[in-house]
Amino acid sequence: MMYSRFRTVAKNLKSTTKPFSFTTATTTTTVSSSEFPQNLTELRARLARESPSLSDFISLKSNNAYSVEVGTKKNPLPKPKWMKESIPGGWKYVQIKKKLRELKLHTVCEEAKCPNMGECWSGGETGTATATIMILGDTCTRGCRFCNVKTSRTPPPPDPDEPTNVAEAIASWGLDYVVITSVGRDDLPDQGSSHFTETVQKLKILKPSILIEALVPDFRGNAECVEKVSKSGLDVFAHNIETVEELQSAVRDHRANFNQSLDVLRMAKDYAPAGTLTKTSIMLGCGETPDQIVKTMEKVRAAGVDVMTFGQYMRPSKRHMPVSEYITPEAFEKYQTLGMEMGFRYVASGPMVRSSYKAGEFYIKSMIDSDRAVSSQS
């Protein structure tokens, strides 16, 4: 059985805290525009050529190339060179930021201090400009140990004009793909699902061609809420499981759990119209093992999830959960290739990848366009 092989491979892919020498000759998930696969056929062909063998994983282990050590107060160490952030810029970045301030809108890009903000907002190498808008306010009712968003048991009520303001702003920006996410709103009777649905529907009316990913909270597993958002007209239903099953209680708020999140993703696949993609994401460097990661991938794929992303956890402040280790680009690429072999339609995996990373959205856009072209011919 193929999954048994994945688990055998994972046991040979050991985590380590010993530093190793990283050079630019190492293969990473970042490529130049000339090397970037331009469609899914090219991507799958490249993955087939570069499919990892058992010896690749054993090599990572023996060369201490799975992860590097995190510094401490007594033994400070610099971040690995691959974790250095780029400075945001570009005219489209400036335009979007100005409009956000005028309309008092929030983006998770800014709230979470995402390192890819400039690339995503400006279009980057692929030309697919994206942004991640956060609705339902900027204060969450939950307190996950990794998250930098403000928290409160009683946040201010949602702005009734927000769906209209968000839709009009996004429609004016010339974006190809937008991610709409929200804080958790356990204080609301419907967990904010109606507000989410209204925002998606109004944006689709103003700009039917835009692709919308809704990155939603778990709605406490409420099927009615999940169904409402799944049928709102979105193109991608995303909900993040955040970490492996074994670390859920240590990383996420006590009201969240692995099985509830998987149920949300399963329900979305059942409720959403045919052709709607489902997506999830996990952070690495929280103390998980390779074997736990592979087992989690198996369960996520069994839930029918189409797209999965992997990124390095970065500690927002000293009051947040510490980073356990920095996973290397080589290890991230192995997870990407294993994910494609498992049957995910796309896997974005790299140290700087976030759940709404635009390189992934470029391929998701290609998948949606391809699926719709086939559907229109049948």
Curated annotation (Swiss-Prot):
Subcellular localization(s) per the UniProt record: Mitochondrion
Cofactor: [4Fe-4S] cluster
Domain Radical SAM core positions: 125-345
Alphabetical list of PROSITE patterns matching this protein: RADICAL_SAM (PS51918)
Molecular function as annotated in GO: 4 iron, 4 sulfur cluster binding; lipoate synthase activity; metal ion binding
Binding site for [4Fe-4S] cluster 1: C109, C114, C120, S356
Gene3D superfamilies named among the record's database cross-references: Aldolase class I
Keywords: 4Fe-4S, Iron, Iron-sulfur, Metal-binding, Mitochondrion, S-adenosyl-L-methionine, Transferase
EC numbers, comma separated: 2.8.1.8
Cofactor note (record): Binds 2 [4Fe-4S] clusters per subunit. One cluster is coordinated with 3 cysteines and an exchangeable S-adenosyl-L-methionine.
GO cellular component: mitochondrion
CDD domains documented for this protein: Radical_SAM (cd01335)
InterPro entries registered for this protein in UniProt: Aldolase_TIM (IPR013785), Elp3/MiaA/NifB-like_rSAM (IPR006638), LIAS_N (IPR031691), Lipoyl_synth (IPR003698), Lipoyl_synth_mt (IPR027527), rSAM (IPR007197)
Catalytic activity: [[Fe-S] cluster scaffold protein carrying a second [4Fe-4S](2+) cluster] + N(6)-octanoyl-L-lysyl-[protein] + 2 oxidized [2Fe-2S]-[ferredoxin] + 2 S-adenosyl-L-methionine + 4 H(+) = [[Fe-S] cluster scaffold protein] + N(6)-[(R)-dihydrolipoyl]-L-lysyl-[protein] + 4 Fe(3+) + 2 hydrogen sulfide + 2 5'-deoxyadenosine + 2 L-methionine + 2 reduced [2Fe-2S]-[ferredoxin]
Pfam families linked to this entry: LIAS_N (PF16881), Radical_SAM (PF04055)
Metabolic or biological pathway: Protein modification; protein lipoylation via endogenous pathway; protein N(6)-(lipoyl)lysine from octanoyl-[acyl-carrier-protein]: step 2/2
Family assignment from sequence similarity: Belongs to the radical SAM superfamily. Lipoyl synthase family.
HAMAP family the record matches: Lipoyl_synth, Lipoyl_synth_plantM
Note: This protein may be expected to contain an N-terminal transit peptide but none has been predicted.
Protein name: Lipoyl synthase, mitochondrial
UniProt gene name: LIP1
